[in-house]
Amino acid sequence: MRSGGRMPESVLLLSGGIDSATLAYTHRPDLTVTVDYGQCCVDAEIQASAQIANQLNLEHEVIEVDCKNLGAGTMAGQQETDLGDAPEWWPYRNQLVITLVAMDVVHRGAHRLLIGAVADDQSHADGKAEFFELMDSLLSFQEGDLRVTAPAIDKTTEEFVREADPPESLLGWTHSCTKSNAACGECRSCKKRQRVLTRVY
């Protein structure tokens, strides 16, 4: 859904997970965007993101670019690769989705792209603080001066949720499974989601 010509100053990459949902609650961006890049759990991500945006009265859009044949690991429905240290590792995934969102919003007046990355999700190189600093430098160097920021990168998910205190009903919409549209309850992301919600609420 397009935002009706409105010029978004701040844009949130909304995956439908706990971290980006909490960031939507704390920062109330002008626009939220979910990217369908061919991941196996995309239907649930889009549904969760739409419900989160609706509850917070935020604009929500979906970008579709099928890159499944370039993916790897459980998120692409394929075998994991030795290059990554987790079964869901997808090469250059965060670089891909950030670039796709940036391409869509930079010419519409956006100046800040918010990413829901946290301290305890830095097992992949593209989840580390250094990565987001490099992406910020890369995008701001180019036309449009779009900045990338990960406001919760120094906090764990549990710390971030406790500090932000979003309503449980909001996080109830979230979907974190990296294997399917129905939460498997067994992958790292499902277990983390359940652990955080149990401890906080």
Kindly label every feature range from the protein language model.
Residues R2-Y201:
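Nucleotide-activated chemistry modules centered on ATP-dependent adenylation/adenylyltransferase
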